[in-house]
Amino acid sequence: MRNTITTLTLCLLAVPAFAKPKNEVVVPLKTGTGEDAGTATFQQEKGKLSIKLNLKNLPVGEHAVHIHAKALCEAPDFKTAAAHFNPENKQHGKLNPMGHHAGDLPQNVTIGEGHTGQATFKVDYLSLDPASPNSIIANGGTAIVVHEKPDDMKTDPSGNSGDRIACGVITT
């Protein structure tokens, strides 16, 4: 009887853990040579998705960061991540009057002389909720990609942002 009560209690305690949607995902990024490029932390908070980048071992300068459609990051070029995450079939760029890809983040990230950089974005057009049409974790997930150049925020399809230099798979 005691074992039955203990088992039932443990089961009841486990139910909320399974029922609660994931509100944070930490993604490690790698360079094309397999070097640690830092992390991206995604946190769902009050209808917005916070994306916190803590990057390292990247070239000094401005770099575009995008969410790409496939949860694949095969080095060295990361082309397996496919095109930008774009469930609404829009064009590229925050400055595009017709709207932008869901994978377009609102600004570039600066990598300083120490080859590190941090940035935080809050967006209302991406979600960790797997039931959301703009979920970055549904259907197997997506990828976060750092590019060699800054995004000009208007040129379709990728803002003239150049090659992909770091990548991380976004899944739960």
State where each predicted segment sits:
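Positively charged n-region of N-terminal signal peptides that target proteins for export
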Residues: M1-T4
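Hydrophobic h-region of N-terminal signal peptides that target proteins for export
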Residues: C11-F18
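N-terminal leader/targeting pre-sequences
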Residues: F18-E62, I67-T172
